[in-house]
């Protein structure tokens, strides 16, 4: 295999290539290259298509061709083969060389779409409006862009603060407590109380006694929380009178009524004592008389004659 020759073609090689193209046609480049020592099929094709073909125009580019190239480049970019198809007698290599050598300096940074050739319709570079701070991107892609000396005045360039993003990191051992659920009742609702009364008893009287008992229990509970002592039921002289009034309204023998009352009181006291022992850890419930208070274990109801 002969050594490949790199560099410009000589006039003798150009003449030999013309004769071979006439003989084999402008397609059999592998066969043609075998007759030209040191030249590959690709090199022969490019030399013919870009320089020696009769269809290639060697005259200077006209103003109309320059405008067509500028419009096409704004639309297609560096697709030189596509742009060359829009021109008669111009190859992609010729169009590319003409753009890089001449048109790029003239048209760089301009958008030629919609340009009709007149100076009035030539797009103008967008300038910074008065009073607004300049925007510096640091990227200048065209020769028409400002150089370093144009933006050397750092006093007019706003420095944007850097933004740091922090990713939340879960803390070890963190406990998420449930939100407390508050349940509130309407303050407009009237108080409702349920009480049991014997036949013939006054309902309002029983209601008053129920409210008094509720107030007494609230006072006892607050004293228990404050002093951390065993609570007592207050001894009141009206308790015996209330039972006597209930006994008078009971039909028949009063002894039967007192028996029923005693059983009810025993059951209530037993339940209360059990609850108190449970709250005090199973200890003894009792104590001394203090301010009219007596231990629950010493409360009893005698027979009323």
From Swiss-Prot:
Biological process terms from the Gene Ontology for this record are: abscisic acid-activated signaling pathway; defense response to bacterium; defense response to fungus; positive regulation of auxin mediated signaling pathway; regulation of defense response to fungus; regulation of DNA-templated transcription; regulation of jasmonic acid mediated signaling pathway; regulation of salicylic acid mediated signaling pathway
> Where are the compositionally biased (Polar residues) regions?
144-155
Expression sites (tissue/organ): Expressed in roots, stems, leaves, inflorescence, and flowers (including stamen, floral nectar, carpel, petal and sepal), mostly in vasculatures and stomata.
Entry keyword Nucleus: yes
Query: Which locations, inside or outside the cell, does it occupy?
Result: Nucleus
**Cited CDD domains:** SANT
Biased composition regions of type Low complexity, renumbered to the chain: 183-199, 213-222
| PROSITE patterns in the record | HTH_MYB (PS51294)
GO CC annotations, alphabetized: nucleus
**Region of interest called Disordered, as start-end residue ranges on this chain:** 116-155, 180-229
What is the role of the protein in this entry? Answer: Transcription factor. Represses the expression of protein phosphatases 2C in response to abscisic acid (ABA). Confers resistance to abiotic stresses dependent of ABA. In response to auxin, activates the transcription of the auxin-responsive gene IAA19. The IAA19 transcription activation by MYB44 is enhanced by direct interaction between MYB44 and PYL8. Transcriptional activator of WRKY70 by direct binding to its promoter region, especially at 5'-TAACNG-3' and 5'-CNGTTA-3' symmetric motifs.
Subunit arrangement? Interacts with PYL8.
PANTHER family, alphabetized: MYB PROTEIN-RELATED, TRANSCRIPTION FACTOR MYB44
The protein's name is: Transcription factor MYB44
Organism, as annotated:
Arabidopsis thaliana (Mouse-ear cress)
């Amino acid at each position: 295999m002969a050594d490949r020759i790199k560099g410009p073609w000589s006039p003798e090689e150009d003449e030999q290539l013309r004769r071979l193209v006439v003989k084999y046609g402008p397609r059999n480049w592998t066969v043609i290259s075998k007759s030209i020592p040191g030249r590959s099929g690709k090199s022969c094709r490019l030399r013919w298509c870009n320089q020696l073909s009769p269809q290639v125009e060697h005259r200077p580019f006209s103003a109309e061709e320059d405008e067509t190239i500028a419009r096409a480049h704004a639309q297609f970019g560096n697709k030189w083969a596509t742009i060359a198809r829009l021109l008669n007698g111009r190859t992609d290599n010729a169009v590319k060389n003409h753009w890089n050598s001449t048109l790029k300096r003239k048209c760089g940074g301009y958008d030629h779409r919609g340009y009709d050739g007149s100076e009035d319709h030539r797009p103008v570079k967008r300038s910074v409006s008065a009073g607004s701070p300049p925007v510096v991107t640091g990227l200048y892609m065209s020769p028409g862009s400002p150089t370093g000396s144009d933006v050397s005045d750092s006093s007019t360039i706003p420095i944007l603060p850097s933004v740091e993003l922090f990713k939340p990191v879960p803390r070890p051992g963190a406990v998420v407590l449930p939100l407390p659920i508050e349940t509130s009742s309407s303050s407009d609702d009237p108080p409702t109380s349920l009480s049991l009364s014997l036949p013939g008893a006054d309902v309002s009287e029983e209601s008053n006694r129920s409210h008094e008992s509720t107030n007494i229990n609230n006072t006892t509970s607050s004293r228990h929380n404050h002093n951390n002592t065993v609570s007592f039921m207050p001894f009141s002289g009206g308790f015996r009178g209330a039972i006597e009034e209930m006994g008078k309204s009971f039909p028949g023998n009063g002894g039967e009524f007192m028996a029923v009352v005693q059983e009810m009181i025993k059951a209530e006291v037993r339940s209360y004592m059990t609850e108190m022992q449970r709250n005090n850890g199973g200890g003894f419930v009792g104590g001394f008389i203090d301010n009219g208070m007596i231990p629950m274990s010493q409360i009893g109801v005698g027979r009323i004659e």
